[in-house]
């Protein structure tokens, strides 16, 4: 199994010689071997896509958001670092971004992993901060009685 390693490439170069736009890094502890879910969107409204990672299968529902502008200079500035569900769950958490409220910031939508039901939770970008868990804008069970998790996107 893979670890929580992130690499980002210039999409125009993928058909020939892939060009990295940021240096590789581990979103979570290197000892984890369950991979991660990733998405990108401008949650802080600075015009750069930020990188959002969610714990992979077998991991906790941890969400990490890193400032995209800083990543381009290989610096890691946390925009958020919180658990988006039951901290005891080990199904990971799926992540997506979408503008839910029409402002200039992307908003975060997360889906529970396998074994944690089928919860979908949304957080407004304006409520996401580097410390603490943001207040949920919405939270619902997408498939009542289903325990296999839910992909969002």
Regions picked out by a protein language model, each given a short descriptive name:
Residues 5-24, 62-81, 119-138:
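Beta-propeller blade repeat segments, especially FG-GAP/WD-type strand-to-loop junctions
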Residues 8, 51-53, 65, 85, ...:
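Functionally constrained cores in energy, signaling, and assembly domains
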Residues 1, 45-55, 102-112:
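Acidic/hydrophobic-patterned starts of short beta strands in beta-sheet-rich repeat architectures
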Residues 2-6, 20, 34-36, 49, ...:
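Repetitive beta-architecture junctions, highlighting loop-to-beta-strand starts
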Residues 4, 25-40, 81-97, 139-153:
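Repeat-based blade/solenoid architectures
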């Amino acid at each position: 199994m893979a670890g929580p390693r992130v690499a980002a490439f210039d999409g125009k170069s993928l058909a020939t010689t892939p060009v990295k736009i940021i240096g590789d890094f581990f979103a979570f502890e290197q000892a984890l071997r369950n991979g991660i879910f990733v998405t990108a969107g401008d949650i802080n409204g600075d015009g750069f896509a930020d990188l959002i990672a969610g714990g992979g299968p077998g991991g906790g529902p941890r969400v990490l958001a890193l400032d995209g502008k800083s990543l381009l200079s290989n610096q890691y500035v946390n925009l958020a670092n919180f658990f988006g569900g039951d901290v005891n769950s080990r199904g990971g958490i799926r992540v997506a971004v979408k503008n839910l409220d029409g402002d200039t910031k992307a908003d975060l939508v997360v889906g529970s992993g396998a074994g944690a039901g089928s919860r979908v939770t949304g957080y407004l970008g304006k409520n996401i901060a580097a410390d603490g868990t943001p207040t949920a804008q919405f939270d619902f069970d997408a498939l009542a009685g289903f325990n296999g998790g839910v992909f969002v996107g």
